[in-house]
């Protein structure tokens, strides 16, 4: 496994992208080496390889996202090898299918990711366009696994910090989803997983604060759009009235002639 790990880590990666995420990468690697977190070390290498060449809507290399998700968990006191490894790989099944022709089984058979990490990655993987019932099933499955729950909340927190890249409609859906499901499962975790109370509390509070801020902004925007729309409609109505008045005057003038 060490040979495979080194093979992945020594690949040629985009130099400019590497400069952007190198500090986060080395921070996590240092923590993992000091604590002998073998799954995390493997996950670092695999996630870097899988996300190479991918970028988020804000232009940053995609690999920076799982690094931030993992770093956040570390900063909140999490040192569990399974949790940190899963946080680094949480998007690979969803976003790296072209590099996983066997549907992700390669993570187990080729790279040495263990079954517990793989199970969390599967729980995190979500199809697009789910309705409320399907979303409730998805989030309920996550909340039953405390380690998956931590990864999901850290993922949501980082995504909530880059909502400015979302379209207005997508942003409103995201805010609603956070209110209906994310805050609920975070509260569930605080009640049922006392070993992670501190991390869950911080994650929940930060997500809630960001979500409320974005909700206020969208409500202000919607109100401004509504006011502008009403103003335009009033002006259009007035223009129509003036045109009718003008036509009436013209007709009256013709009659007089």
Model feature map: region roles:
Residues 2-255:
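Active-site helical microenvironments for divalent-metal-assisted chemistry
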């Amino acid at each position: 496994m060490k040979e495979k790990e080194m093979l992945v880590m020594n690949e040629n990666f985009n130099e400019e992208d590497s400069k952007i995420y190198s500090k986060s990468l080395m921070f996590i690697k240092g923590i993992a080496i000091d604590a002998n977190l073998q799954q995390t070390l493997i996950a670092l290498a695999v996630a870097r390889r899988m996300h190479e060449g991918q970028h988020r809507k804000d232009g940053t290399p995609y690999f920076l996202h799982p690094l931030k998700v993992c770093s956040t968990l570390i900063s909140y006191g999490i040192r569990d090898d399974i949790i940190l490894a899963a946080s680094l790989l949480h998007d690979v099944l969803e976003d790296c299918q072209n590099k996983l022709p066997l549907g992700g089984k390669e993570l187990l058979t080729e790279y040495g990711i263990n079954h517990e990490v793989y199970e969390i990655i599967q729980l995190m993987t979500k199809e697009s366009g789910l309705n409320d019932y399907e979303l409730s099933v998805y989030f309920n499955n996550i909340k039953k696994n405390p380690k998956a729950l931590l990864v999901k909340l850290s993922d949501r927190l980082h995504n909530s910090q880059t909502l400015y890249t979302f379209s207005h409609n997508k942003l409103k859906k995201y805010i609603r989803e956070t209110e209906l499901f994310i805050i609920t499962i975070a509260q569930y975790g605080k009640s049922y997983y006392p070993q992670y109370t501190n991390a869950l509390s911080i994650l929940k509070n930060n997500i809630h604060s960001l979500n409320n801020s974005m909700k206020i902004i969208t409500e202000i925007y919607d109100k401004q759009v509504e006011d502008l729309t009403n103003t335009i409609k009033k002006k259009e109505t007035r223009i129509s009235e003036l045109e009718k008045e003008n036509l009436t005057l013209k007709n009256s003038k013709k009659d007089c002639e």
